[in-house]
Amino acid sequence: MATEHSNRKPATSASDADITDWRPEDDAFWESTGKRIAYRNLWISVPALLCGFAVWGMWGIITVQMLNLGFPFTQAELFTLTAIAGISGATMRIPASFLIRLAGGRNTIFLTTAMLLAPALGTGIVLQHKDWPLWAFQLMALWCGVGGGNFASSMSNISTFFPKRLQGTALGLNAGLGNFGVTTMQVVIPLVMTVGIFGDFGGEAMTLIKDSGWIFGKIAAGTPTWIQNAGFAWLLSLVPLSILCWFGMNNLKTVSADTGHPLVAFAKITYLYTLAFVPSILGLYLYLPKPTGVGLISMWVAVPLDIVSALLVMKLAAFGAMKEGVSKQFEIFRNKHTWSMTALYIVTFGSFIGFSMALPLSMKVIFGISHVPDVNGVMQHTLSNPNAPSVLSYAWIGPFVGAAIRPVGGWVSDKIGGSIVTQIVSAVMVLASVAVGYVMMQAYGSATPETHFPLFLGLFMLLFFATGIGNGSTFRTIGVIFDRQQAGPVLGWTSAIAAYGAFVAPIVIGDQIKAGTPQNAMYAFAVFYALCLILNWWFYLRANAYVKNP
């Protein structure tokens, strides 16, 4: 007798990109067929996502080296480069969170990975020219945001391949190992800048005017460096990864039924990404000071304006079958859990990516300077500190800790529940933020700030550890609360909003450093964490919680 699924296209052919029969909750199907395909897609997704994070986050390291090379920009202007990459990547995640259902997993991951070739190449080109205007560097930082968008589509895609009981583990592996892109970038870029690995094709070296560093220690002023390799190096991995995505990944037709021909899918992706760039550029133009922008609005207006504009543009500009697909996925905004989980993911991932972006330059400014008063007793922050720690030797450790521990957060949450884990890490983050703020205050008022560096570094490692565990727990909770049709878009949406931490953190910390009160940034973050701790208890842990410890 024919079975219910006998006339369906089999899901067992590795060469068949489109799968029409997908039943991960069916144990027999999962063990015989689904498990192999799901893990193959996962292990291709991870390095692709890693490179996305690397390209997105690399301006945090590049700006430190630009300062060491004497690029003619102020500290505030260098902070804007990191922030621009942050806001662009966050905005790209808004359309990216919907792409899997509109264009298919394999189509989306392939194209968005291949798209990274352009900003990697462009960044390498502009970094060879100290005399180019600031807007040229800002444009490249904006373009690098494509890498930030990849997280939303990657997580949305992987969530569709695995059964609910493995959501925490699978998403933790994809996100945690993908997050290693930040650490990989912070280790690889200082390394490749020390050697002219591309020969004559890679351009000429520049000479350091300040001490720099890499994972093994300091690099003295006067040493030649190839800062352009910070962009060029990623071409070596992006080309083979793009090929691997195309030939090794799959589209699940049970999730993405109407993707059309791959060229049609590519057109949808490109169209939605182009739409998302418009509000990013508009928001940045209104926010950034002259001459790049007009400086009319604050960051706290720019971010919600950017989010609302991106959603409206997508909603109004979509057409045909794409309009119906976008409208259907907008239904997630009617669910109160979408909003609660968005806030909680800002606590975890927003902090992880925000600190990853802001920490290198913050360390350089706080610990690389001897803070001494002038003859009038006014504190000055211009005297170079000869005993300063090498920023590039330490900046990678925090993101490494956060990324490494994230899969553990998902695994533990699968065992004891995601919300209780989130509650614990939120409490830790409140205390650690207050403590690190106090240490920053002490260091920024000291002629020997390096004496405070070990405690500063240790407390930030604790913060990164907590964010990593929390990243895994919050994504596990989303996988349990929402059904299979909504879980992917919600994962993408929450990651999009949390990614604005990559814009907010560098600006907030940079502004407070400029004001002479860096501790206030950390105290403000602690207040937000405390509010979200109460939110998590109300929604998921109290006696009559909406959903008990998902």
Map each language-model feature to its residues.
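Extracytoplasmic gate region of multi-pass secondary transporters
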Residues: 59-64, 274-304, 335-403
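Hydrophobic core of transmembrane alpha-helices in multi-pass small-molecule transporters
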Residues: 133-149, 449-469
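Glycine-rich segments within core transmembrane alpha-helices of 12-TM secondary carriers
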Residues: 148, 168-198, 495-505
